[in-house]
């Protein structure tokens, strides 16, 4: 256990991007809505509610984990559906990188209705260096050209190099409901997109049609009892994918069974104690995100109060349940009134599958070991992505206190550290419910994480 505690203390604030103003001054369009490392970890992409995608590149000239601005482009624009009289937001719901096959980068981005495949590449800009109209070679006062030696043919010179982005494909008009997930297959040729009631299978090179592989829409919408909340392909087996539902279950599908995957090959469901059921039970059991482990052996699911780790070979119960917000059970009525109970927190595995990460309120996020021999509250650490990290880093030379980590679920005994990465007691009366960590991504090969905190992107690392 000492080794675990030593490793927890190594986490430190590395970087922060974004406006450092007060929360009250934040523009809605600047709020980050998606974060994703690429398959190498050298590039990091974020999407925001203004429809923009910003890319960062690893700065290898610096020690530790540090990124620099790479490029930015407008991915989606606001639209209007005249048939349904609905506005379609430009907000980026998900970003997924495609595996790199040449010098160009490819990534998928989606809003509620339209998915786009973007190509990003280095483009040389050239300018005309000289010709006979150039002031240095000819003017009206010199008269007409009389000899061939006076002729100056236009010549192009290298002027600058930019990162160009253009939509290679646009996959539109395939979803009647809001898209909540996209996932690229391990075959690097296909991907899925999921909305509330359907999942479609696409070929990356074909944008005008897709195959509907899951459809849970009842004939009578009054009989609707659940919606799809998240979907993902298996990281190794290209025939397997899973999706989660608002009923709190996860269904594993095999594309080889049938064209329409109505019957899952496995159903993962944690049976709730009937005596503890309440009005809020169905809401808090709704799964907001699911992820496969890197080796495909385990599944991580996040509902409002817990993280659960499932073995794909064991459907009856999770191998580990990690309580996150038990102190909020007494506040569920208030959280229902202010809609916080419907917040959709994401979750992710570490690159080595030894830890998992998910967010909380007051800009807290937790890192937890996956070892099922440890109790759910053992060996965990809670960090805070806050602007105090800036101020602390600038005053690091002035005896900044050591990073404090929450161990063994001792929430209230730890003071807040000046590094901005300390535990903050999860007293439900003192939590800031406007500051929440909904989106995060873990570097594929090292212990570095990217955290979206409102309009700021934080990077924490052990390096």
UniProtKB/Swiss-Prot annotation:
PP2A exists in several trimeric forms, all of which consist of a core composed of a catalytic subunit associated with a 65 kDa (PR65) (Subunit A) and a 55 kDa (PR55) (Subunit B) regulatory subunit. Disulfide bonds: none annotated. One of its GO terms (molecular function) is protein phosphatase activator activity. One of its GO terms (biological process) is negative regulation of induction of conjugation with cellular fusion. Keywords: Phosphoprotein, Repeat, WD repeat. PROSITE patterns: PR55_1, PR55_2, WD_REPEATS_1. It comes from the Eukaryota. One of its GO terms (cellular component) is protein phosphatase type 2A complex. The gene is pab1. Belongs to the phosphatase 2A regulatory subunit B family. This is Protein phosphatase PP2A regulatory subunit B. InterPro entries: PP2A_PR55, PP2A_PR55_CS, WD40/YVTN_repeat-like_dom_sf, WD40_repeat_dom_sf, WD40_rpt. Signal peptide: none annotated. Phosphatase 2A affects a variety of biological processes in the cell such as transcription, cell cycle progression and cellular morphogenesis, and provides an initial identification of critical substrates for this phosphatase. The regulatory subunit may direct the catalytic subunit to distinct, albeit overlapping, subsets of substrates. The modification Phosphoserine is found at residue 134.
